[in-house]
Regions:
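C-terminal helical cap/extension that packs against the catalytic core
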Residues: 233-243, 348, 356, 401-536
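Nucleotide-state-sensitive switch-loop elements of NTP-binding domains
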Residues: 134-136, 142-163
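Short functional linear segments
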Residues: 1-103, 110-121, 128
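Short beta-strand-centered segment that lines the nucleotide-binding/catalytic pocket of NTP-utilizing
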Residues: 121-138
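Active-site-proximal loop/hinge segments that shape catalytic or ion-binding/gating pockets
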Residues: 545
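Active-site-adjacent alpha-helix immediately C-terminal to a catalytic or transition-state-stabilizing loop
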Residues: 550-562
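Nucleotide phosphate-binding/pyrophosphate-handling subdomain across enzymes
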Residues: 170-171, 183-194, 198-199, 264-410
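Acidic, Mg2+-coordinating active-site environments of NTP-dependent enzymes
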Residues: 3-5, 9-31, 165-175, 190-320
Length: 562
């Protein structure tokens, strides 16, 4: 590797540490040496993101790292070195008044609620989260807005430094993976910490039980720093309790949102779904604690209630939410989580659920949304379509089985690629997997779905004769499976082609210039297109991967890419 390339990698490591697939363990194993901070070259936003993408670890090297596990503590030591290369010390982070949040599901929504609540007090907020949905600059937000393309281009290798230079009053920092050895855990003195709902995810890195995962999440606890969590299963909650005692961290269990609402009007949430109430309850406690520890007035009047004990954990105080808190909860926006886009006859339901528990919550939300929908006035049928992909070490068969009760008429699978060739869009590039891997994975998803569909003996609404093999220009990756099964599933080579088939030109915003050649080569695609074209309403659930949801949003909401 040339000195210039090594130089650039060192300078960008801090900003890229939480990007897809890259870990400080990888960088530490490569032994990058220290270099002075380089002068920023003149470049456009996409050029900056492409340069940042050079730090994504390729799939082959990731496999090597999995086989040769090193000491995870070296990741944090390496992270401190990379921070120093950017011109900062760990002590500089102490001045950011950080709220540090981890969890398996809901941590992003909790952070969004918390940031919006405190911004409603007139405080200047910073927000670091991952992954991004459409553009990488979404990961750094000042006062709720993603950093501009111009500023990202200027500061893209010093993103933490960017927070320091804007002199924010506080920073809400979302953990990337786990907690104990996550790159964000170089934070030494947060004001308060939070743990959202726990579940099974990233098992190759965090462990294969919820208890092992809870130990990792509890790694963000700090001596003397208050921490809050929501009600968890007894096993992982006991692990969090023991971890807190070991570190001398005061850990509290959040009361329910109903307890905070008692005696006042209901709290309106900007995010849909019953599961968001747990995230909102945690966010209120984090904001309340931060305001108290910063001696900020207006933290909310405590209610007359005796503190309780549950599972040997003290309950956090019950207080009356202030008008600022109510405003913050109501105004919270968090794209790609229980999000609904209504476009003519099409309604897109977007939720980046990717764990069993979060998919269960997604299914409840989707079914409730359908129950409360307005009936279409047209004479055609109502059609339900699933657009799904899953990545990493997640069990797609288990996730797809949870989605069966939604009674989809059609299941569509595609990789997290917006276009067949996404080289022109650096924000959507992912070098941590190969193209062959993602296409094979989609075919496996289809096979799992067909097997589940056959088990359920669902009526075949999309029957078609056995197809002839598609031509070389076909956009469908696989013909019908040779064995007898439901014909209600298709695989497309990218998100754009999947959306074109699902929408049939009926989405007023998503209007590709011309349908790609071969879109209807497959007999099932041809027969299904007629049904979709005549449907009075089409309900599309997009789930399984935040990256899939991000790619869909990029195409359905072009303004997000501006």
């Amino acid at each position: 590797m040339s000195p210039a390339r090594n130089h650039l990698r060192a300078a960008l490591s801090l900003a890229a540490a939480s990007a897809r697939g890259v870990t400080t363990q990888v960088a530490a194993q490569r032994g990058l040496s220290a270099w002075p901070v380089p002068q920023e070259p003149s470049m456009e936003y996409q050029d900056a993101v492409r340069m940042l993408n050079t730090l994504q670890t390729n799939a082959g090297y990731l496999e090597q790292v999995k086989r040769q596990r090193g000491d995870p503590q070296t990741q944090l030591e390496a992270m401190e070195l990379y921070l120093a290369r950017s011109g900062l010390q760990v002590e500089d982070l102490d001045r950011l008044n950080i709220i540090h949040v981890t969890g398996t599901k809901g941590k992003g929504s909790t952070c969004a609620f918390t940031e919006c609540i405190l911004r409603s007090y007139g405080l200047k907020t910073g927000f670091f989260s991952s992954p991004h949905l459409v553009q990488v600059r979404e990961r750094i937000r000042i006062n709720g807005q993603p950093i501009s393309p111009e500023l990202f281009t200027k500061y893209f290798w010093r993103l933490y430094h960017r927070l320091e230079e804007t002199k924010v009053d506080l920073a809400v920092v979302e953990v990337g993976i786990g907690g104990a050895y996550d790159c964000t855990n170089i934070i030494r003195k947060p004001v308060v910490c939070g743990v959202s709902s726990l579940g099974i995810d990233h098992t190759s890195l965090l462990g294969d039980t919820v208890e092992k995962i809870a130990w990792q999440k509890g790694g963000i606890f700090k001596r003397g720093v208050p921490a809050f969590t929501v009600l968890q299963p007894e096993g992982p909650l006991a692990v969090l309790r023991d971890r807190a005692q070991e570190i001398s961290c005061p850990l509290y269990l959040c009361p329910t949102l109903e307890a905070l609402e008692e005696g006042g009007p209901p709290l309106a949430l900007g995010l849909e779904g019953e599961h968001q109430r747990s995230n909102a309850a945690l966010a209120l406690q984090l904001a309340h604690c931060w305001l108290q520890r910063q001696d900020h007035h207006g933290a909310g009047e405590l209610k007359a209630s005796r503190p309780g004990i549950l599972w040997q954990l003290p309950l956090a105080p019950v207080f009356q939410p202030t008008s600022h808190m109510r405003l913050g909860l109501r105004n919270t926006e968090w794209l790609g989580r229980t999000q609904v886009l209504r476009r003519g006859p099409l309604t897109w339901y977007l939720d980046g659920a990717h764990t069993p528990s979060s998919v269960q919550a997604c299914v409840r939300w989707f079914r409730q949304a359908l129950q409360g929908r307005e009936r279409p006035s047209g004479s055609g049928p109502e059609v339900r379509v699933l657009l799904f992909n899953a990545t990493g070490d997640r069990d797609p068969a288990a996730l797809l089985k949870l989605l069966q009760p939604c009674q989809f008429d059609y299941a569509v699978f595609c990789p997290n690629l917006t276009e067949v060739s996404s080289t022109g869009n650096a924000d959507q590039q992912n070098f941590t997997v190969t193209l062959d891997q993602v296409l094979l994975r989609c075919l496996e998803h289809q096979q799992h779905w067909n097997h589940l569909d056959k088990e359920q003996a669902s009526p075949d609404l999309w029957s078609a004769p056995s197809p002839e093999p598609g031509g070389p220009t076909s956009l469908l990756l696989a013909p019908h499976p040779p064995h007898t099964c439901s014909a209600s599933s298709l695989v497309f080579s990218c998100i754009s082609h999947a959306l074109q088939w699902i929408s049939q030109g009926r989405d007023p915003v998503f209007q590709p210039p011309t349908p790609p050649k071969g879109l209807l080569t497959h007999p099932v695609a041809h027969s299904g297109a007629s049904v979709l074209h005549e449907a009075a309403a089409i309900h599309v659930l997009v789930t399984g991967s935040l990256h899939l949801v991000g790619g869909v949003l990029k195409l359905l909401e072009p303004a997000l890419s501006q």
